[in-house]
Amino acid sequence: MSRLKAINGIMLRPIIWKRPSSNDAILQFIRQNQEISQSSVFQGTLYEHTVMRELSGKLSMNQLQKIGGSHDRGVDIRGQWPLDFVFGQVTKVVPLDAVPKRCKIHGTTLKPLRCKIEENDGKLDPLKALVQCKAFSGSKVSPREFRELVGTFASIVPDSQRNRSVILMCSPNLLTKEGLSLINTVKVPLIYLRIEMLQRIGDNYDVDNSGRLLNYYENDYAAALLQGCGIKEWLKLSLYRR
């Protein structure tokens, strides 16, 4: 018998996430937790599962683990991002512009990861991905929450590994002007993903046509680090469908 997990006093039935790119895990979670389906805990956890599906299916992230809890330090999901795979697939279809060997962003000099991929015969160790989910449909992410996210990154990732990790904020809402201005000043690779919440159809959820990745935005630091890796081409051309 599976053990129940309590969050804020509400019991959630855990699931084993085997194939994040499919809807199986989402449907299993919904089915096993019908009795609390009106709670905010259920909605938040459902959104995390939806985000995992999109990270795997649209951005080719893998080894995704949902870790949210009292000791998560603000991180809901961890995983790995094999950018060399994305780069390799994109360059089979379209040419990518050359990138500089070094670039300077906000007073920090860095080497674009594209250069490392080319220097290592198309190989690169996967980036560590730290993901925070904000499953609220009525309010946009505030600058304070972005500052807290940057603090989370700094507390988990040592300076020596800053360019080997990315932190992602996922929300159903568009960025505010204040939030956009703030994230473009920070010296960490931060990506904002606008991912829909699943929509209800009667008593069921439309897992096939909702919960989609709508917007992908890199802050200035991430844009410098990830330039030329083909991520935007990968998304624009829907190469993840192959």
Swiss-Prot record:
This is Required for respiratory growth protein 7, mitochondrial. Belongs to the RRG7 family. It is found in: Mitochondrion. It holds the Pfam family RRG7. It comes from the Eukaryota. Keywords: Mitochondrion. InterPro entries: RRG7 (IPR018828). The lineage of its organism: Eukaryota, Fungi, Dikarya, Ascomycota, Saccharomycotina. The keyword Mitochondrion applies. The keyword Chaperone does not apply. GO terms for cellular component: mitochondrion.
